[in-house]
Design a protein with these regions (language model features):
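Amphipathic alpha-helical segments used for helix-helix packing
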Residues: 96-119
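Basic, helix-initiating cap at the start of DNA-binding domains
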Residues: 1-23, 27-39, 52-56
Length: 191
């Protein structure tokens, strides 16, 4: 793709992300994406062969941003496993306090595509969640947690549950409750 086409491609990806996030993948048309980026539909299809391919590229871009943010978060955490857990759930509560917060876009997308198990976007979402969980395992291992992969899976399960319940109930206290449960889990694993 020509170098001058990159800004157009980035604009398309940014607009598609916003529209998919606000309204859901199935409720957004390629016409709307073209209109939002002020390009013709032909230009849109020159960059992305299909809406499915566009979604895959949007998710890849969001995956990279989210992983970078999570790594930055992890780099700021030092000390005890409890500090890691408390930081994770504190940041989840802060994230959930954003205006018009709607939970994890990756999770919402998988729910939207539940009847399409082979859809490429689902594979990207699976990989995204697995990479975040693996990074948490690395943080826990560096903090001296035994069986860090297993503990990370359990804590990740609590974080996903907290995200879902904060979205359903609009109550950020679920993050603190999940942090308490995760810390109990870590303490009990030391006995």
């Amino acid at each position: 793709m020509a170098r001058s086409a990159e800004p157009t491609r980035r604009r398309i990806l940014a607009a598609a992300y916003v529209l998919f996030r606000q309204r859901g993948y199935s409720r957004v048309s390629m016409d709307e994406i073209a209109s939002a980026t002020n390009v013709t539909k032909r230009t849109l299809y020159n960059h992305f062969q299909s809406k499915d391919q566009l979604l895959a590229f949007v998710l890849e871009a969001q995956n990279e941003l989210a992983l970078a943010a999570f790594r930055t978060f992890g780099d700021q955490l030092t000390g005890s496993p409890a500090a890691i857990v408390d930081g994770l759930f504190r940041d989840l509560a802060v994230w959930a306090d954003r205006p018009r917060w709607a939970g994890s876009g990756f999770t919402r997308l998988v729910i939207e595509l539940a009847d399409l198990p082979g859809h490429p976007a689902r594979a990207i979402a699976r990989r995204h969640k697995a990479l975040l969980e693996a990074h948490l395992a690395d943080l826990l291992k560096r903090a001296g947690v035994r069986d860090a992969r297993r503990r990370a899976r359990e804590i990740w399960l609590l974080s996903e549950g907290a995200i879902s319940l904060m979205l359903v109930h609009g109550d950020r206290a679920y993050a603190a409750a999940a942090a308490d449960a995760a810390n109990r889990l870590l303490r009990n694993s030391l006995r």
